[in-house]
Amino acid sequence: MDISTPCIKCQVHSKYIEEQSEPSKNRYVFAYIITIKNLSKTTVQLMSRSWLITDSNGKQLTIEGDGVVGQQPVIEANDEYTYTSGTVIETPVGVMQGHYVMTDHKGIDFITEVDPFRLAIPNILN
């Protein structure tokens, strides 16, 4: 597996979901929207994902699985794929990071890193 990423960029936006959260029970729900941009000249396919989620107490959760939201999307050259998913942590602040395993048009697997992004309720300092 190649660890270099051929022109794949990921943009992430996270959002606190107040109506599904229960702070009194240490339940904080967050949605995240990820856009994967294929800036290369060839088609790629997202095969699997791996996430490390850490709350502000240092509790960690690793999530791995095939595809994203039940799909293994094919992303054409100069196109993008956006999806929304979510996670629950026990603190009002956390961080999430990970990577995707993708396959290029020649069937060669490579890793696309997703830089750490913050999960936080609005207007909180930590």
Swiss-Prot record:
Q: Which domain of life is it from?
A: Bacteria
Question: Which residues belong to any copy of the ApaG domain?
Answer: 2-126
Under the heading PROSITE patterns, the entry gives:
APAG
Q: Which NCBIfam families match?
A: PRK05461.1
Q: What is this protein called?
A: Protein ApaG
The scientific name of the source species is Vibrio atlanticus (strain LGP32)
Query: Upper lineage ranks?
Result: Bacteria, Pseudomonadati, Pseudomonadota, Gammaproteobacteria, Vibrionales
Annotated gene: apaG
